[in-house]
Amino acid sequence: VRDVTYNVGWNHNEITQLDAGLQDWVWTGDKVSRGNNTKIQVNKVGQPINSFYVFQQVYDENGKPIEGLYVDRNGNGTIDDDDRYCYKNPAPDVIMGLTTKFIYKNWDFSAAFHASIGNYVYYDFLNEKAVLADLSKDNIFRNTTAEAVNLGFWGKTTKATNTSDYFVRNASYLKCSPVC
C-alpha cells in the first residue's frame, strides 16, 4: 500500500430567520413539469434550505399510492395548501471521499470513491409521465416508464398529483471514478 486518504463531512442546515418583513417561508427552486407554475421547494424558518413542500401521499394496503388522496395533516376535513409539509431536502447529510494507490512490484492500481448520503431529488420525469390519460394526446403516443404505468393514475381527480411526497426520492450514491 502506497497511499490511502479519506475525508468525511457532515452537513446540517437549518434556516433560523429570513429577511425582516417577510413571512416565515418563501418559495424557491424551479417549477415542476406538470404543475401549472407549481413550485415544490421552500425556504422556511426551522427547516433545511430548499425543503420539498409537498402533500403526504396515502397508500393502499399493497403500498401503492392512491391518486389524489393525501393526509389531512391539519385535521380540518379539507385537503388544501395548509396540509402541505416540509419533507426532505436536496442537501446531503454526509459527504465522503476515499482515494487509494496500491503498488506491488511493477504493478500499480489507484481508485477514487466519493459518496453523498441523505440527499433527495424530486423525480420530475416520473411526475410528468404519471398521468396515463396524457400518453396519447393529439393522436401522438408519448414515452413513459413502467413505474408510471403501474401507478395507474388517470387524471380523474382534481387534486394535483404533482405535489405528492411520492415523487421525492433518495438520491444517495457511491461512485468510483475511473480506475487506473
Segments from the language model and where they lie:
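Conserved small-residue
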Residues: 1-90
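Secondary-structure transition into beta-strands, especially the periplasmic turns and strand N-termini
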Residues: 1-4, 101-111
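Membrane-embedded beta-strand positions in outer-membrane beta-barrel channels/transporters
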Residues: 3-5, 95-99, 178-180
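Transmembrane beta-strands of outer-membrane beta-barrel pores
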Residues: 8-14, 104-106, 115-119, 178
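C-terminal extracellular loops and terminal segments
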Residues: 28-42, 46-49, 87-97, 101, ...
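Extracytoplasmic gating/loop element in the C-terminal half of outer-membrane beta-barrel translocons
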Residues: 62-64, 116-180
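Active-site proximal loops enriched in glycine and acidic residues that flank catalytic Cys/His/Asp
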Residues: 83, 111-117
